[in-house]
Amino acid sequence: MAGFKTKVTPEIENLTEVCKEHTSLDISLYAKYDVKRGLRDINGKGVLAGLTQVSNVKATKIVDGKEVPCAGSLSYRGYDIKDLTRGFIEDDRYGFEEVTYLLLFGSLPDKKQLTDFTQLLANQRSLPTNFVRDVIMKAPSKDIMNGLSRSVLTLYSYDTNPDDTSLPNVLRQCLNLISVFPLLSVYGYQAYNHYIKDKSLYIHNPKKELTTAENILRMLRPDKKYSHLEAKILDIALILHMEHGGGNNSTFTTHVVSSSGTDTYSAIAAALGSLKGPKHGGANIKVVRMFDDMKKEVKDWKDEDEVRTYLKRLLHKEAFDRKGLIYGMGHAIYSVSDPRAEVFKAYVETLAREKGRMKDYALYSMVERLAPEVIAEERRIYKGVSANVDFYSGFVYSMLDLPLELYTPMFAVARIVGWSAHRMEELINADKIIRPAYKNVLEPAVYVPLNER
């Protein structure tokens, strides 16, 4: 790329070593000054940094005056996620729009409120004239998340009142972004697929009478066709990813950036940058790729001993990416169980049966059962380990024929709702910029003139 240097030269390599030499910290100092690395204690529990009413993530209970692990639970505005998803399934209806209303406004809508709100979102589900051509199709990104961030920041220029942080204006902006995130994500992928992978280009308009999940599948597929089961399970997947407390990295980023008084587009773009990180939103891609490697290495998928041996090789950095991790296992908060994974699993088997993927499902189930045992045998752990939401979400997306490049953007399509609820909460309740402290651990230096160095 002319004019923009993209190669790491020997000079840059040398400067990197200089930077490392003078920047690396003695890790023993964290304990000395009682600094919680990653803002978490030794058990993974986060440092209390704020208050919220948006959602509650629970993984412990008090027994005989002591805090002990329990089955994980997740509630949105006080409503258990299992009850919410069960209600949508039993009524055979979609829930994304209803849960969006719940998270933003704090209560479940009645029929009229839901109809009006769904129509409001549908009416805003369009992009500025020529936005797809002039923004999304120009210089498409190799990573859809970066393209999504660029699109969000560019929408600032199309907003006639972008910097107004009054609550009605911020709510308007949030609802607009919630409505168009599916378009930005799918169209971003279509541009990538055409200009970078040299595939045919399909741009389908959304239909107002369809739900978010239905429109995603319609816009993504060349023939615009999908089954009712596919759309329902994608709807459930989106609901499970919509919100997860104020302390997860991208939502905390939303709080931090919102506290500065900046505009909505900048705050959401910052959250997207956080979510892109493989330690946050990209984990389900790792799970799928790990299983792809496992299927090549394990000859008999039904042989527990062979699967167990592969899992041990993962932990010993002898398989897959050699990072020593079994992806999809363990969570910063949950230890006994991740309620989102439990909800997912209830529908995964049904979809696997429809898609002819029962052999894959059996392997996933075996790994879910064996991995905690292997980790307990091979590692010193401070709490239990169980499958997290990423363990099954990648498998679900693969059965829905979603390309890997869209896995994290689908996370964003869901989590924009949670970010919006937390941005509103921050603006309504907080009046101070978030500004924690860092302890300096370097001794003072005496200045030396240039000609004496």
Regions found by a protein language model. Name each.
Residues 2-453:
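Non-transmembrane, aqueous-exposed alpha-helical and coiled segments at domain scale
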